[in-house]
UniProtKB/Swiss-Prot annotation:
Pfam families: UDPGT. This is Putative UDP-glucose flavonoid 3-O-glucosyltransferase 3. InterPro entries: UDP-glycosyltransf_plant, UDP_glucos_trans, UDP_glycos_trans_CS. The lineage of its organism: Eukaryota, Viridiplantae, Streptophyta, Embryophyta, Tracheophyta. One of its GO terms (molecular function) is UDP-glucosyltransferase activity.
């Protein structure tokens, strides 16, 4: 009789990738009661906020599913927190964890109760393929962004390695690129920032190249959302099998993992939303790393005041210059906002710090979402049927903005090519236009399409749905 399979999941450091990884861990063990998961937790100091509490909340769970998910904390490492050092050393940090990963997995391989079936490594942890190879087990990649982005990265890597084409040549270019995973020509100005700088493009394309060594790629998406991109990927014989298994979202966050102050803030926010009419509130939130300088904050404030719509604005203080840290809450918003703004808008708006994003998007009073277009936020807004006005900041968010606006007609645009720390301000006029557009979609096809895509995303996870079936194929593979 064959032993139950044990998969080792290795997420990148930081809460963002960890949440998606644990969602797929829960999904896997819920589908197969003979499957066990071990999650290896790396502690990179600059991005470790919230990780310990989140893991502990799951480890403390008494559900049968959680009992088959084991966590191993790898040794802590002290590192410099300056911006340059973190950017340059994250890859090196992950590489340095290889011996710790090998040690942690040694006991699993020798287990008399389970069979080590393979590694599922985060998109930034492909160096752990080396460890899997040493142990003689297969590797898979978990890609936390969308299929169109995955296709773009494979395309850029192929251009470099087969045609000697340097993607950094597209920096400041007005060119439009033909990418198989995108239906429309892609403006070079929405390429991920790291693809436009040699120091970051080269190592990142090397990471993507290693995807080709694996036995499969799990992607947090679903067929109805990205059918064109998924078809393009499956048509390329040089790319491993792609398994769309999303949308993977943490919709039932455990209140025990947040402190009592955050619970109080959440209750206060939801109470305020309870008093607003249906679909009347525009929600502005820019992710765990999103913040603006004071001049841009004033442009947003002026736009909100002139637009006249009810609003809930998550406004956070930028970290000190030169340091990599999460934005923090202001002690007092009055110093950064235009004089008298809070008094003039007190009847229609609420300015907050930290926001319980999923709970807010789920609230019936919310009718629009001004978002940085992180992939998780994009999926969350679709799940809850809330149209987005796009304002990307960093990473692949410009792609995530282009796709729903131009490819799928599921969003409106404030700015698709804006980048964090850009010297160019997005004007109050542009922001106001985007707010009005996203909030006045009552008779628009966009709101209707968003609602339809919401239903398709939910059906994808149901028995017989596209993602349900795809996950089953992956389980059969292991």
């Amino acid at each position: 009789m064959e032993k139950p399979a044990e998969l080792v999941l290795i997420p990148s450091p930081g809460i963002g990738h960890l949440v998606s990884t644990l969602e797929i861990a829960k999904l896997l063990v819920s589908r197969d009661d003979k499957l066990f998961i071990t999650v290896l937790i790396m502690h990179f100091p600059a991005v470790s906020k919230g990780t310990d509490a989140y893991v502990q909340s799951l480890a403390d769970s008494s559900s049968p599913i959680s009992q088959r998910i084991n966590f191993i904390n790898l040794p802590h490492t002290n590192m410099d927190h300056t911006e340059g050092s973190v950017r340059n050393s994250l890859v090196g940090f992950v590489e340095s964890q290889q011996p710790h990963v090998k040690d942690a997995v040694a006991n699993l391989r020798d287990s008399k109760t389970t069979r080590l079936a393979g590694f599922v490594v985060d998109m930034f942890c492909t160096t752990m393929i080396n460890v899997a190879n040493q142990l003689g087990v297969p590797s898979y990649v978990f890609f936390t962004s969308g299929a169109a982005t995955l296709g773009l990265l494979f395309h850029l890597q192929e251009l470099r390695d087969q045609y000697n084409k340097d993607c950094t040549e597209f920096k400041d270019s007005d060119a439009e690129l033909i990418i198989p995973s995108f239906f429309n020509p892609l403006p070079a100005k929405v390429l991920p920032g790291r693809m436009l700088v040699k120091d970051s493009a080269e190592p990142f394309l090397n990471v993507i190249k290693r995807f080709r060594e694996t036995k499969g790629i799990l992607v947090n998406t679903f067929t109805d959302l990205e059918s064109h991109a998924l078809h393009a990927l499956s048509s390329d014989a040089e790319i491993p099998p792609v398994y769309p298994v999303g949308p993977l979202l943490n919709l039932n966050s455990n209140e025990s993992r947040v402190d009592s102050d955050e619970v109080k803030k959440k209750n206060d926010i939801l109470k305020w939303l309870d008093d607003q009419p249906p679909l009347s509130v525009v929600f502005l939130c820019f992710g765990s790393m999103g913040s603006f300088d004071e001049s841009q904050v004033r442009e947003i404030a002026n736009a909100l005041e002139h637009a006249g719509h009810r609003f809930l604005w998550s406004l956070r203080r930028s970290p000190p210059t030169g340091k990599v840290a999460f934005p923090s809450d202001y002690d007092d918003h009055t110093g950064v906002l235009p004089e008298g703004f809070l008094d003039r808008t007190g009847g229609i708006g609420k300015v907050i710090g930290w926001a319980p994003q999923v709970a807010v998007l789920a609230h019936p009073s919310v009718g629009g979402f001004v978002s940085h277009c992180g992939w998780n936020s994009t999926l969350e807004s679709l799940w809850h049927g809330v149209p987005v006005a796009t304002w990307p900041l960093y990473a692949e968010q410009q792609l995530n903005a282009f796709q729903p606006v131009k490819e799928l007609e599921l969003a409106v645009e404030i700015d698709m090519s804006y980048r964090s720390k850009s010297p160019v301000l997005v004007s109050a006029k542009e922001i106001e236009r985007g707010i009005r557009e996203v909030m006045e979609l009552d008779s628009s096809d966009i709101r209707k399409r968003v609602k339809e895509m919401s239903e398709k995303g939910k059906k994808a996870l149901m028995d017989g749905g596209s993602s349900y079936t795809s996950l089953g194929h992956f389980i059969d593979q292991i």
